[in-house]
A protein has these predicted regions:
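Extracellular/periplasmic carbohydrate-active domains that bind, remodel
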Residues: 1-519
């Protein structure tokens, strides 16, 4: 067994227990820090808090009395701690603590900590600055007010003085549109870590954010955590809940880490995606537990205006050791992906009770820069996922989503509006209690999916499966226990793929140029 240090700050650390488990370890283990037992863990990704700065730590993992492995690190330097209660914050659940906490943030020097002790701190929007560490103690809650008139507004676009360029702030579902600023918000900042065992609560279940969710009222709904044009940002350990819309939304940002978080929203809350990196690069999502009302992770890169202008894909995304429950899709690409998604890997994760496992949503009109390339899913456990694998090039989003141009299965000319799906690989996946279909791959007839490789995949069905549509597009009929449907693919490889218990044929193909079956 290998034990590694994933990250450490002056006050915290995260270790990874590599015992072959996915999200959960194979057994509960004792965690001993500098000779003192501090916890029992069942998580592959385990975080430690309450550490001291500039201190050497030895972390040992035991199965009973048997030492399995260890790792060592020295915590970082810390200059000073700024306790927000010394700036006037009360944490009594009544006072508006926004300005007091913001004062501590703005006064914080480099290599220092903003400390939020236990209590309930009512806030509107807090704005981050560069080179800070913000800790939420166990029992600390940042709880948003429900009154929308209290929140600042980010304009969609501001024109430059010379009228040659523009400055984008607000965004909504892939377009530059006015929005309320995030509850936690950062613009053009770098080197920030937010960590701890506390909670950031959007309080949307007590507000009207979820009423008429697609209607802009003054501005579009805020995100719980929003960063724009930032780099070197880390979130560790914190619980995020009750978001007004998308929960964590990094936008045109790079070098991001999301480690050991909990992201929770009610199952019926609209558009409360868990984590949506949009036109972001070098993103690690590690050991996060999602349970919410929409897609757990949705990787995006804007609609066609932003895709054409900025040509910024989401790239180098690594998702591992996560638990994704109760969402529409576990990992979704799109539908706003006009800038493309390149080099995405999902591994060692568990998907439970989601409508779909992998979910690719695209359509005509996303544009020629909407390229999906080098997408890999491996070493995954899926249980009670309605349809484990879905690639849908006819997604009926947007006002024109049900027009003939978007929905026609007849070939259209390939032009600057036509998206591209290249190679996707799925390997070492066990899918049990499937309901609707084993897989549903539906490419464009004029721009076929270039290659799909499935290797070492087993799929079986629930005893009493639900009947539903495998993909959101026109003409797709409801089904249950359907096999694998593949349409408009240039090259399909089935390498040790087992589908058992389906009704009808295990494989239906239409417009597939080449099929390789290896047993």
């Amino acid at each position: 067994m290998e034990i590694i240090t994933v990250m450490h700050t002056a006050r915290s650390a995260t270790i990874e227990i590599r015992d072959g488990g996915r999200h959960f370890t194979r057994s509960p283990y004792r965690v001993v820090v500098n000779g003192q037992e501090v916890m029992t863990t069942e998580k592959v990704i385990t975080s430690l808090f309450g550490l001291k700065p500039q201190t050497a730590y030895q972390v040992e993992i035991y199965d009973g009395d048997r030492l399995l492995g260890s790792t060592a690190f020295t915590t970082e330097y810390e200059f000073v701690t700024l306790d927000v209660t010394r700036f006037g914050a009360k944490g009594d659940g009544l006072q508006d603590d926004t300005h007091f906490i913001q004062a501590a943030i703005m006064a914080c020097p480099e290599n220092s900590r903003i400390y939020i002790p236990a209590g309930t701190y009512r806030i509107t929007s807090l704005f981050l600055k560069s080179h800070i560490r913000l800790e939420l103690e166990e029992g600390a809650e940042l709880k948003a007010f429900k009154d929308r008139e209290k929140f600042p507004i980010f304009p969609a676009m501001l024109e430059s003085y010379d009228e040659q360029d523009e400055y984008n702030l607000g965004t909504w579902e892939g377009n530059p549109l006015p929005m309320f600023s995030g509850i936690i918000c950062g613009v053009n900042v770098e080197d920030v870590i937010i960590y701890g065992q506390g909670t950031i609560n959007g309080n949307a279940s007590k507000a009207d954010w979820w009423d008429n969710p697609k209607v802009m009222r003054t501005a579009f709904r805020p995100r719980l955590f929003f960063i724009s044009h930032c780099k070197d940002i880390t979130l560790q350990g914190v619980r995020f809940c009750n978001s007004p819309s998308w929960t964590l939304h990094p936008y045109f940002s790079n070098q991001l880490r999301f480690v050991g978080l909990v992201v929770e929203n009610p199952a019926d809350s609209p558009n409360t995606d868990g984590l949506d990196p949009e036109s972001c690069k070098d993103v690690e999502i590690l050991g996060v537990r999602f349970s919410l009302g929409d897609d757990c992770i949705a990787v995006k890169s804007g609609k066609i205006y932003m895709g054409r202008k900025h040509k910024t894909p989401s790239e180098n995304i690594h998702i591992r050791q996560c638990l994704m429950e109760n969402g529409h899709g576990a990992v979704t690409l799109g539908s706003e992906m006009a800038g493309g998604v390149v080099n995405l890997t999902v591994e060692d994760c568990i998907f439970r009770h989601t409508d779909r496992g992998l979910r690719i949503k695209t359509r005509r009109g996303r544009g020629k820069d909407a390229i999906l390339s080098n997408i890999t899913f491996r070493n995954l456990t899926l249980d009670h996922v309605m349809t484990p694998l879905v690639v849908n090039a006819f997604y009926f989003c947007d006002p024109d989503g049900k027009t003939r141009y978007v929905q026609s299965r007849d070939p259209y000319p390939v032009d600057e509006r036509t998206p591209v799906i290249r190679k996707m690989t799925f390997e070492n996946m066990t899918c049990t209690n499937c309901h609707v279909a084993a897989a549903y791959f539906d490419g464009l007839p004029e721009q076929k999916i270039e290659e799909i490789v499935l290797k070492n995949i087993t799929i079986s069905y629930a005893e009493n499966p639900k009947c539903d549509v495998p993909a959101m597009s026109e003409g797709v009929e409801k089904s249950s226990r359907r096999g694998m449907f593949v349409r408009n693919v240039s090259h399909l490889v089935l390498d040790h793929v087992s589908i058992s218990g389906q009704e009808g044929e295990p494989l239906e193909t239409i417009g597939v140029d080449k099929v390789e079956v290896r047993e």
